[in-house]
């Protein structure tokens, strides 16, 4: 037998290895790759996308308007909005029945309760815009400075909320005298005094 460099074999798969070319019948092994490694690679490709898909919805209500519309507590995404914006809205709809808890949604996107930055993190994760939950302090440095066309995150020490396609995703009713603290959509404007406005690049 003769040893041949891996050549066109993917460099990110066993990069320091060489494969062995056996001069045998076609039915016999040509690339003696560890079966356990192959199994892990295949399962990773199948299971991980499925888990992500189960956590965040791929569809939801839409509206023909240019901005999101609130219907019985659920937001309908603008038909013309980019897919990431729609997915952020549909994901945030799932949190409307969740209670508020300080630190909620930070150990994992999937939680029983959420705080302000955990709520915003969840919506952005569904859109593929964050890879892990972020705190209010971290959101002050997120993306680019200023309001976005579709998504704007308002962050300061201790609180974060977002405006997505014209609706405010917040955990406080703002006036602090009515309602209760919980992830909710609000049509009412909240003055951003003291907040840093940030937005995802391109949105």
Predicted regions and their residues:
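N-terminal hydrophobic targeting signals that begin at the initiator methionine
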Residues: 2, 31-34
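Secreted/periplasmic proteins that engage bacterial cell-wall peptidoglycan
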Residues: 82-143
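Cationic, amphipathic, low-complexity segments that mediate targeting or membrane/lipid association
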Residues: 3-7, 14-16
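Short, positively charged and aromatic/hydrophobic N-terminal segments
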Residues: 18-22, 29-30
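...with weaker cross-activation on analogous glycine-rich loops/strands in unrelated enzymes
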Residues: 89, 121, 127-203
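Intrinsically disordered, low-complexity
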Residues: 34-100, 175-203
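Polybasic, lysine-rich low-complexity intrinsically disordered segments
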Residues: 11-12, 24
